[in-house]
C-alpha cells in the first residue's frame, strides 16, 4: 500500500463562513483514499493542502481506490474501518450505498451551497446519482496513440483499436469489463442506444467477448492509470486506453509524441463517499472535509492541475488556465463541445447491478 503523509500545519485557522474547522470533537488525522498519479496530485494541491493549512489536520494518502469495494467489505466484516474518505467512481458508490457501507448524505444540509446562490442539490443536479455519493469531477476513459507509429492516417474512431491490419502492434486496455465490453459491441455493429440491452443477455456478452478475442493476443492489460501513459511513452504499444487526464499530462506536460482520440470517450463520474462504521469524531471530520473539498471554488481549483471537469455547475465559469503551463483548460475538458461530439454515456446503475457477475466472467475469459 503506497502512502504519503501531508505536512501538518502548526496552527489551525478558522475561516469565516466555514464550519468549525478546529472543533475539538473532530479527529486530528484522516486517511483519504484515491487513485494516485496526476489525479491525486491535483487533489493534494486543490483540497488536501489548503484543508490541512486551515485545520492542522494530518492527511494520509492511500492509493487504493481501484480496490475500494472489496477492501471496504473486508473492513466492515472485520469491524475495523481504517479509511475516512474514499474517492470512487459512481457505480461503486451505488454498490457501497446499497450494501450499507457508505454514509448517506443530505446534500442541502451537509454540503456547501453554490457560489451562485444555488443549493448543493441544484448545483450538482443529475450528478447526484446516489444518496451516498458526493460528486467531484466528470472525466472520461478514452484512447491515446503514438503519432509516430500510426503512419499517415491517424485513427479517428475507437474501432481502430480492433483494426490490426491498418494499425498493427500492441494495444493496452484496462483489465476489467467496463468500457471494453461496450466498445466491443459498438465496433461490432450494435447501435449506441442498444448496447446495454444487448449486454444484458448471454448472447450479447458472448458477442462482446468474441470481438475482444480478435485482439486479445495483441493486448497489454493494465490495472493502474499510469500504465498506458508509460507504455505509450516507451513505444511498447501503438495505442491504448486510459483516463483523459493521464493523456493530457503525457501530451501537454511531458510533450510525448501522442495524440488523443476523443471518439466514443466514456463519460464517468468520480467523487467521495464516507464509509459507515467511523467513530463520531472521525465521521465529523470526514463530513467537514468533503464540505470544504466540494465547494464551488475548490472544484474549480482542481481544474488548474488536471483536465477533468468540475461536477458543480457553478464551478465551470471559474475554470481558467493551468497552474504551471498557462494554457486554457476548458478546451482540454472531456465536456468541451468539440471533444464531446461522439460520447458514450456510462450506465452507473446497470454496472452496479451487473459488475460482480461480469467481473467474474471477464477474469475467466482472460485466463482462457
Language model segments and positions:
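Gram-negative bacterial Sec-dependent N-terminal signal peptides
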Residues: 1-22
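Conserved C-terminal helix/tail region of periplasmic/extracytoplasmic solute-binding proteins
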Residues: 335-368
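A ligand-binding cleft/hinge motif common to bilobed small-molecule-binding domains
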Residues: 93-95, 239-257
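A bilobed periplasmic-binding-protein/Venus flytrap-type ligand-binding module shared by bacterial periplasmic
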Residues: 142-149, 185-186, 269-282, 301-304
